[in-house]
């Protein structure tokens, strides 16, 4: 049974992404224009200079990790923009997810306080922008002068084995990934306009879900004033409509201190999503305050091993389970390059429905990487590391049930699910894969929840 036109709030960040595929000659000139004594392969808390940008970029390349870091000044942002030949595409977690949800048949309600014509042209016409109590197509909403302001994020994409020069010698990329340098006074403040706030509050009873992100963009010196209004907004939605299904994406925070503050405010959310790097930050948070991972029967079975130490996927299951218990929420999911896993309570969704939802997300992300479109044909090859993790998962006991490409384990009120990714050998896109997987998974989950209520 198809649930037509589900209304889903998408907030908060939407912007233009300026993309650059790293090329040795151009990046060499940029590095040569900086002070070599200020360049070291290390992650900076923010970007105050060319040297900070290069140091953080080299760190991500060397470790194959992704990150998003704030650029501190408009002047530096203009220097970065002038230094590379950029291509432009839709960016911002909320914008990417709203577009995909509209393609899937939902009716997304997008917060877009900085909507100018070039950005509006990249949004699906099925995305609704609240204006004066009604939803308008993006192209029409962009004609309003109070919504017009251009926002750019600089995305440096790199591929495995790319070689980049540095003052300490060439550095080779460990994995495909991206580094994002952001100067964005709108999304970093998590701004929402009055029309969006009023529409959501007035129509909350008819809204089925909300998928929220952008908390990681808050500056170090302002997060304590930025978070409370947004968390209060989530609380008001949940109290007015207890059936609304709310998923929050964590993002790459500038510091563990900000991450700790954010996680303590999440009791009204149903679900939290993270990538593998963000999981490390989040679990450092609960470890730091003395919470320990759960030791339920289902987890002790899943994590049993004859090896001297647990496999990486088992460690991530343990950390995700501990985080879910610490937060007291329904579900935690972790999307990695090799697989997507989730830990959830039984009740809202069956184990099979969750696994099919994860497969929907993994397939959409793989299709986007391989073809440039989430609705394209996904590749056939299963990620070998993800497949091996699934096989180990199924070897943990008879309770692990293989369903299609993935598997789940259900016991004592908890469900652990693992879905291997598909492998795009020559990816066309590396940005927005996590958002795509998250939105497609969320849509499938919400369909299952709605079916159960009918």
Each model region followed by its residue ranges:
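Ribokinase/PfkB-type carbohydrate-kinase core domain
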Residues: 1-431, 435-436, 442-454
């Amino acid at each position: 049974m198809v649930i037509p036109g589900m209304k889903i709030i998408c907030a908060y960040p939407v912007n233009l992404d300026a993309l650059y595929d790293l090329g040795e000659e151009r990046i060499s000139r940029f590095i040569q224009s900086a002070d070599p004594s200020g360049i070291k392969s290390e992650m900076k808390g923010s970007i105050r200079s060319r040297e900070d940008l290069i140091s953080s970029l080299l760190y991500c390349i060397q470790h194959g990790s992704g990150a998003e870091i704030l650029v501190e000044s408009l002047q530096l942002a203009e220097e970065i923009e002038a230094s590379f030949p950029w291509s432009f595409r839709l960016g911002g977690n909320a914008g990417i997810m709203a577009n995909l949800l509209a393609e899937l048949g939902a009716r997304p309600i997008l917060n877009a306080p900085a909507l100018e014509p070039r950005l509006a042209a990249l949004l699906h016409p099925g995305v609704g922008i609240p204006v004066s109590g009604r939803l308008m197509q993006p192209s029409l909403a962009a004609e309003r002068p109070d919504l017009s302001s251009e926002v750019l994020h600089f995305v440096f994409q790199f591929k495995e084995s790319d070689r980049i020069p540095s003052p300490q010698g060439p550095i080779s990329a460990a994995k495909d990934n991206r580094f994002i340098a952001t100067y964005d006074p709108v999304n970093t403040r998590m701004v929402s306009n009055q029309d969006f706030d009023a529409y959501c509050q007035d129509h909350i009873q008819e809204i089925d879900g909300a998928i929220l992100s952008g908390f990681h963009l808050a500056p170090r010196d302002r997060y304590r004033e930025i978070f409370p209004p947004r968390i209060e907004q989530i609380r008001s939605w949940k109290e007015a409509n207890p059936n609304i299904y709310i998923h929050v994406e964590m993002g790459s925070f500038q510091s563990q201190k900000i991450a700790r503050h954010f996680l303590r405010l999440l009791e009204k959310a149903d679900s939290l999503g993270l990538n593998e790097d963000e999981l490390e930050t989040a679990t450092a948070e609960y470890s730091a305050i003395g919470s320990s991972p759960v030791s339920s029967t289902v987890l002790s079975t899943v994590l049993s091993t004859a090896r001297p130490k647990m496999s990486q996927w088992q460690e991530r299951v343990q950390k995700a389970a501990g985080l879910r218990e610490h937060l007291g929420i329904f579900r935690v999911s972790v999307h990695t390059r090799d697989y997507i896993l989730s830990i959830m309570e039984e009740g809202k969704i069956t184990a099979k429905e969750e696994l099919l939802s994860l497969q929907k997300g993994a397939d959409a992300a793989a299709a986007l990487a391989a073809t440039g479109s989430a609705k394209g044909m996904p590749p056939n090859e299963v990620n070998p590391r993800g497949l091996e993790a699934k096989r180990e998962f199924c070897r943990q006991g008879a309770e692990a049930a293989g369903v299609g490409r993935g598997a789940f384990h259900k016991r004592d009120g908890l469900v652990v699910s693992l879905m291997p990714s598909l492998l795009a050998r020559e990816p066309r896109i590396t940005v927005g894969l996590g958002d795509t997987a998250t939105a497609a998974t969320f849509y499938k989950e919400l369909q299952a929840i709605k079916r159960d209520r009918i």
